[in-house]
Design a protein with these regions (language model features):
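Cytosolic regulatory regions of ion transport systems
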Residues: 1-245
Length: 245
């Protein structure tokens, strides 16, 4: 009724301007409302996404570039770009928002962005997301997809399996053939990767527990592999926690 009332023709000279703030979950909502927007309407619709706001807050508090070395933008092209690898465990609402936002915010000079999403329903989710954003999910650099999916339960995929030497089957969207392709990938995460992880598997306790396990695995990798100093690289792991307990 409120929406209907606000769309009645206002009296001349006293047209009210009403702003409606609505929460939403569907990432397509903004495009839908933009498409039906009419000129000279007395109402203004402002969409709010709790999921999007929370991911933005995380990336404002701990930006993606916090895991990188200082970037010298005066060098063009950069002789050896840094490898920013974003891990997303769980491809629900929060996980996919983290994936999309990381894709937008991870576009920095002198940086090679690599996003790996782990979920038991990876193929179905990738097909859905690629239909919405084919250019995003079909992007590749030197033949390497920017976004890849691993179809597995997150706890069963340790960082050892995702690092060079641990072969897993990865999925990516083939933009040319407009289909999802699978590849036996021996290095979803390279040894020189600067790691930033989101853990969004649903349950707060599970997210926290897996984040701690992931931190130990990454730390052990630095010790065992003789990789660059853990304290200098400072990987970032962001578990999704809703409970205040």
């Amino acid at each position: 009724d409120m929406l209907e009332a606000t769309h009645k023709d206002p009296q001349a000279g006293c047209a009210p301007k009403i702003t409606l703030h609505c929460t939403h979950k569907n990432p397509d909502d903004a495009q839908i409302f933009d498409a039906i927007k009419a000129d000279n309407e007395p109402t203004c619709l402002h969409l709010l996404s709790r999921v999007q706001d929370e991911i933005y807050d995380v990336l404002e508090e701990a930006p993606l570039y916090s895991v990188l070395e200082p970037i010298d933008i005066s060098v063009d092209p950069n002789p050896k770009p840094q490898n920013l690898t974003v891990l997303v465990f769980g491809a629900g609402d929060f996980g996919m928002q983290a994936t999309r936002t990381s894709f937008w915010m991870g576009r920095m000079p002198g940086v090679r962005l690599n996003i790996v999403v782990v979920d038991p329903n990876a193929r179905t989710i990738l097909e859905r997301e690629a239909a919405r954003y084919p250019e995003m999910f079909g992007e590749s650099c030197n033949g390497m997809p920017t976004i890849r999916f691993v179809q597995a339960e997150a706890p069963s995929v340790t960082t050892d399996r995702l690092i060079a030497g641990g072969t897993v089957t990865t999925l990516h969207y083939d933009a040319q053939n407009k289909c999802v392709s699978s590849t036996a990938d021996s290095a979803p995460i390279t040894d020189d990767a600067r790691l930033y992880a989101f853990v969004t598997m649903g349950d707060c306790g599970q997210n926290l527990s897996y984040s701690l396990m992931l931190q130990r695995q990454i730390f052990n990798r630095f010790i065992d592999q003789g990789s660059p100093d853990y304290t200098k690289q400072q990987p970032v792991i962001c578990p999704h926690i809703e409970s205040e307990e």
